């Protein structure tokens, strides 16, 4: 009884096709099957995610902006004048010994610390 070959028979026309040449290259160089697609996904992901991170920084720039001179002057005028001695006496006059401890309501599922 003859032994069967482990390789499939492929005609010369099949061997010259682009798919067969690529399959032979993948067998010889596994980088083409695993490494190249991985690197392609990493590089493409970088290009796709760049605009997403730019949106984050643009939103921050809109929130934090430089004030104009007029806005700056209005903020300074509306601020309360602070004198160190007056602040000291105001804080010293407060009664810090008369206070009551109150529990804060916990969120659902949060440990309240009670046994």
From Swiss-Prot:
One of the record's GO cellular component terms: mitochondrial inner membrane
Transit peptide: 1-11
Main location: mitochondrion
Regions annotated as coiled coil: none
The keyword Chaperone belongs to this UniProt entry's keyword annotation: no
Top-level taxon in the UniProt lineage: Eukaryota
GO BP field: mitochondrial cytochrome c oxidase assembly
Keyword annotations of the record: Membrane, Mitochondrion, Mitochondrion inner membrane, Transit peptide, Transmembrane, Transmembrane helix
Keyword Iron set for record: no
Topology within the bilayer: Single-pass membrane protein
Alphabetized InterPro entries for the sequence: Cyt_c_Oxase_assmbl_COX16 (IPR020164)
A Pfam cross-reference name: COX16
Transmembrane regions listed in the UniProt entry: 30-50
Disulfide bridge partners, by residue number: none
Intracellular or extracellular location(s): Mitochondrion inner membrane
Function: Required for the assembly of the mitochondrial respiratory chain complex IV (CIV), also known as cytochrome c oxidase. May participate in merging the COX1 and COX2 assembly lines.
PANTHER family: CYTOCHROME C OXIDASE ASSEMBLY PROTEIN COX16 HOMOLOG, MITOCHONDRIAL, MITOCHONDRIAL OUTER MEMBRANE PROTEIN 25
Family in the record: Belongs to the COX16 family.
Identification of the protein by name: Cytochrome c oxidase assembly protein COX16, mitochondrial
Gene: COX16
């Amino acid at each position: 009884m003859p032994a069967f070959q482990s390789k499939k028979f492929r005609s010369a026309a099949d061997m010259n096709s682009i798919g067969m040449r690529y399959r032979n290259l993948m067998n010889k160089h596994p980088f083409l099957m695993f490494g190249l697609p991985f690197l392609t996904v990493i590089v493409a992901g970088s290009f796709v995610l760049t605009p997403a991170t730019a949106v984050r920084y643009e939103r921050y720039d809109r929130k934090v902006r430089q004030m104009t001179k007029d806005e700056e002057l209005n903020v300074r005028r509306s601020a309360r004048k602070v004198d160190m001695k007056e602040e000291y006496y105001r804080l010293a006059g407060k009664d810090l010994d008369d206070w009551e401890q109150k529990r804060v309501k916990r969120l659902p599922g949060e440990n309240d610390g009670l046994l």
